[in-house]
């Protein structure tokens, strides 16, 4: 039989246990911590939590970040609509402490609904707006965005048809706080020359600009004093590009200048540029660097040419490469090497030396007519440490099987390389790592590999990565023994096969 003392202790323990169960410790946390908890959940789960109590409803309606992309799907438009977003925004309080930091959504929408959503977001002083919309017609750039005094970052993308930019006169004086801007599928047939749109009066604080799929754009000038990153992609009709900015550090232009205009031009005035990416663009008629790119660290050039006015295109490519002569790292695409290998290429032009170059990557077919070009490029890189050669395999390439007896032929490629040893002395004294991709044990790549092994005094490692077409293990073993059989200039050199 329990005593009164034992009963009291037992009852006290039960009351303490019930108290722990009844107390909602999470709800009593500060709003900032509860917001962090809700932000870790998908928005749909956070909305469901708001049904628990008035406290959680208030927390949900005061979330600083709303990401509706986690609950909607453009491929299934019936699963979500702009009305749902509008209702959530409408229920929010307009207190200063309840401002909207960021809003993201992907939704099919009419222009009227889109304008209402953006107006409501601007009313809540949104700072970061990231939206992608599907519409049944072209639409105009929402004017509420232009006049917002709180917007810091904007991403506007049309998933199908596109939108029109406001006139330059309307943009001037707007976007005063914007630091990041990304626009995709812009319709510019009525204003093909944007020479005074992306300038300081309209974008005094802009640091990052991304433009993609600008239809009808022919000439573009970007001149914002605080701009640090600029990317332009898929503007096929572009004929002229002018970029200037003392703080610009990264410039990326991809898939542009497809109009084949005889007056196409590029002007670059970015003295502090560190990264230059020029990918899949047609060679322009002229290139002008108004300042030396002495801060350049990385450059990538992949171009293609059209069969009109070849002389100006070749000269344009040389001007482009010469403007990149201060780069630490350079990657050249296959067409760039082919243009340099043309009859009017390197034989009649001279590249400025790349004294700062430490890393060089070349994409090439490695045909016989490429050999002199490679030699000239190596001469232009006297301090190079790392060389990567990616061999492009196609049906038109001359790929003769390697035969060790070719060493004795006076007209073989290896003899040409041997004749270049003196002029390549500095290059050979600094080269440490070589990697050849697409190695199929043909004469072209074997001649290059043997030459670098025989004369590379600083060589540490040569990596040969075979093409998937070459999996003959017996032949690979024979090639390995032949390569190691030649006397190497460096006692540290090792050969790795993959």
Swiss-Prot record:
Spell out the residue ranges that the record assigns to LRR repeats.
Answer: 148-172, 175-200, 235-259
Does this entry carry the keyword Methyltransferase?
no
One Pfam family assigned to this protein is: F-box
**What keywords does the record list, in alphabetical order?**
Leucine-rich repeat, Repeat
**Disulfide linkage:** none
Record-annotated F-box domain positions: 23-71
The chain positions of domain FBD read 416-466
InterPro entries the record matches: F-box-like_dom_sf (IPR036047), F-box_dom (IPR001810), FBD (IPR006566), FBL13/AtMIF1-like (IPR050232)
Annotated protein name in UniProt: Putative F-box/FBD/LRR-repeat protein At4g03220
Instruction: List the source organism.
Output: Arabidopsis thaliana
- Taxonomy of the source species: Eukaryota, Viridiplantae, Streptophyta, Embryophyta, Tracheophyta
């Amino acid at each position: 039989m329990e005593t009164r003392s034992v009963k009291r202790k037992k009852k006290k323990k039960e009351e303490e246990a019930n108290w722990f169960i009844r107390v909602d410790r999470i709800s009593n946390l500060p709003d900032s911590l509860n917001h962090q908890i809700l932000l870790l959940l998908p928005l749909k789960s956070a909305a469901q939590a708001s049904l628990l109590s008035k406290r959680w409803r208030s927390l949900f309606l005061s979330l600083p970040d709303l990401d509706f992309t986690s609950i909607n799907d453009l491929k299934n438009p019936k699963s979500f609509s702009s009305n749902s977003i509008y209702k959530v925004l409408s229920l929010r309080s307009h207190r200063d402490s309840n401002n909207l930091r960021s809003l993201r959504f992907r939704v099919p929408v009419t222009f009227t609904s889109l304008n209402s959503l953006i107006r409501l977001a601007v009313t809540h002083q949104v700072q970061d707006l990231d939206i992608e919309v599907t519409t049944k017609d072209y639409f105009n750039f929402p004017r509420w965005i232009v006049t917002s005094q709180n917007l810091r970052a904007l991403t506007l993308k049309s998933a199908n048809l596109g939108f029109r930019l406001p006139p330059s006169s309307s943009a001037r004086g707007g976007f005063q706080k914007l630091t990041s801007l990304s626009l995709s599928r812009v319709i510019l047939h009525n204003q093909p020359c944007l020479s005074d749109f992306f300038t300081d009066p309209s974008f005094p604080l802009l640091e990052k600009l991304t433009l993609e799929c600008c239809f009808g754009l022919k000439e573009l000038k970007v001149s914002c004093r605080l701009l640090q990153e600029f990317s332009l992609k898929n503007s096929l009709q572009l004929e002229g590009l002018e970029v200037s900015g003392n703080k610009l550090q990264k410039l990326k232009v991809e898939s542009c200048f497809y109009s084949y205009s005889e007056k196409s031009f590029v002007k670059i005035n970015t003295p502090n540029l560190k990264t230059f990416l020029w990918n899949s663009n047609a060679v322009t008629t002229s290139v002008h660097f108004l300042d030396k790119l002495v801060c350049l660290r990385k450059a990538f050039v992949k171009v293609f040419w059209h069969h009109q006015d070849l002389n100006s295109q070749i000269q344009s490519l040389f001007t482009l490469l010469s403007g990149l002569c201060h780069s630490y790292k350079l990657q050249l695409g296959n067409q760039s090497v082919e243009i340099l290998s043309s009859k009017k290429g390197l034989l009649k032009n001279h590249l400025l030396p790349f004294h700062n170059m430490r890393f060089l990557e070349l994409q090439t077919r490695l045909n016989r007519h490429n050999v002199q070009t490679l030699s000239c490029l190596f001469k232009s890189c006297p301090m190079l440490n790392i060389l990567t050669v990616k061999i492009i395999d196609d049906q038109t390439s001359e790929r003769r099987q390697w035969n060790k007896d070719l060493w004795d032929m006076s007209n073989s490629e290896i003899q040409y390389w041997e004749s270049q040893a003196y002029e390549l002395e500095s290059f050979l004294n600094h080269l440490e790592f070589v990697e050849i991709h697409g190695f199929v044990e043909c004469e072209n790549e074997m001649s290059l590999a043997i030459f670098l092994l025989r004369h590379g005094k600083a060589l540490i490692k040569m990596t040969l990565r075979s093409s998937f077409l070459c999996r003959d293990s017996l032949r690979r073993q024979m090639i390995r023994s032949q390569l190691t059989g030649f006397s190497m200039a460096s006692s540290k050199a090792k050969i790795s096969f993959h």
